[in-house]
Amino acid sequence: MAELYYDNQADLNRLKNKPIAIIGFGSQGHAHARNLADSGLDVRVGLYPGSKSWAKVEAAGLKVMTVAEAAREAQIVMILTPDIGQADLYREHIAPAMEPGKTLMFAHGFNIRFGQIIPPQGIDVSMVAPKAPGHRVREVFVQGGGVPALIAVEQDATGGAFEDALAYAKGLGCTRAGVLRTTFAEETETDLFGEQVVLCGGVSALVKAAFETLVEAGYQPEVAYFECMHELKLIVDLFYQGGLNYMRYSVSDTAEWGDYTAGPKIITDQTRAAMRQILADIQSGAFAEDWIDENHNGRPRFNAYRQADINHPIEQIGRELRRMMPFVNPREVKPGEGGA
């Protein structure tokens, strides 16, 4: 059974005299810094000199300094920058300040799990990973609630790594909802698997393949877009609220019957075998090695994949149709822009 922890099991006083450095001020960094500060903790934000976020930190009323300065001042250093780049950032600016007894924290285990960051033996290494985007972590906290989180300890040099991580989670508001204890390996491997097989890779490929099937059969691309992409949100929202059962309760009996009869034809034994191979590649480190090499080589395949999907007909049709629907709050990514 999962180990769950709540507010009454976490002691925020453990962190009252432990300065905290939040490295990065993106989605998660913004939420962590502001929530912890509002919880009465001593927070500073570490950024590169000249960072566009510098003024945002100052506007939020928080202390801001370089990454190296923040790491030197802090007892707890939470790295909240993108996975790729963390290792160099750590080696150049954080590692020199990681004296025995300090704590290095993460919100995702990629660089620890795959050996890109190897902390010294004398420090604690832990993880607090809220299961929501940063804006929601902040929004729910301000409303008096919290989002669930995962918590893990990779290295416990002081004997109090878990208790400090739990206190940190309380500072974020996460123990109001409940935090689940895991390991760096479990969090990293399941996170990558979910992204690749369902949330990003699986859903994107399914939507495109279904759209292409309808268009090739002579149906209007606009109708195919509505059926294969636009309406997906309606179903995902039902999943989010009440799981598969609530979705089936909410749709028509015809849709539910099609769910039962057609679904197994899409997810076949071959599909499940592919899922197992994807998981094996994650567990072995093959995926991480490929992704790290891709970045070292300038991302040629990554950029080609991205451009191909930008040019896919479903994207062209989608841009046109979303202009008809201002209520969906249409967002378009400019050329050259990308996520973390």
Swiss-Prot record:
Pfam families: KARI_C, KARI_N. It is an enzyme of class 1 (oxidoreductase). GO terms for cellular component: cytosol. Its EC number is 1.1.1.86. One of its GO terms (molecular function) is NADP binding. Involved in the biosynthesis of branched-chain amino acids (BCAA). Catalyzes an alkyl-migration followed by a ketol-acid reduction of (S)-2-acetolactate (S2AL) to yield (R)-2,3-dihydroxy-isovalerate. In the isomerase reaction, S2AL is rearranged via a Mg-dependent methyl migration to produce 3-hydroxy-3-methyl-2-ketobutyrate (HMKB). In the reductase reaction, this 2-ketoacid undergoes a metal-dependent reduction by NADPH to yield (R)-2,3-dihydroxy-isovalerate. Belongs to the ketol-acid reductoisomerase family. This is Ketol-acid reductoisomerase (NADP(+)). It comes from Chloroflexus aurantiacus (strain ATCC 29366 / DSM 635 / J-10-fl). The gene is ilvC.
